[in-house]
Amino acid sequence: MNDPLVELPLSFQHMSMAGGIRAAMYRSPDKVAYKHGDRTRNYRDLVNRIDRVSAAIIGDLGLEPGDHGAIVAGNSIEYMEVVIGASQAGVALATVNPKLAPAELVDICDDAEARV
């Protein structure tokens, strides 16, 4: 039924989330990649935005692969773009619920050793 040990095709093994999205873009650039509410993003636009986020994380924020960061945000298309863009840049993100108390936010960011 829902066997969690389904073997993936070789082309999917060892592929990052950003790599999988990029591969889908090459196959179907105009296909809807993500929908949140009434907003959508096709694969071409999603890859473009993920690339821009990755570049900003490295260039503007000064983070490097291996660094840690945090994002405090609700679910949105932009949230997904930041999480995947950070992953593509090699930055591990702690995803933090914006409804938490400020002290909890600080504790989570401290535990995650988030630079930003």
Where are these regions (language model features)?
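Structured binding elements
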Residues: 90
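Short, charged, surface-exposed hinge/linker loops at domain edges
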Residues: 1-11
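Short beta->alpha connector loops at strand-helix junctions that form conserved
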Residues: 96-98
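Active-site charged/polar residues at nucleotide-handling catalytic sites that mediate phosphoryl
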Residues: 111-115
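Anion (oxyanion) recognition and catalysis
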Residues: 87
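A short N-terminal helical cap/helix-turn-helix that marks the beginning
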Residues: 10-32
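Conserved AMP-binding/adenylate-forming core of the ANL superfamily
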Residues: 13, 30-84, 101-106, 110
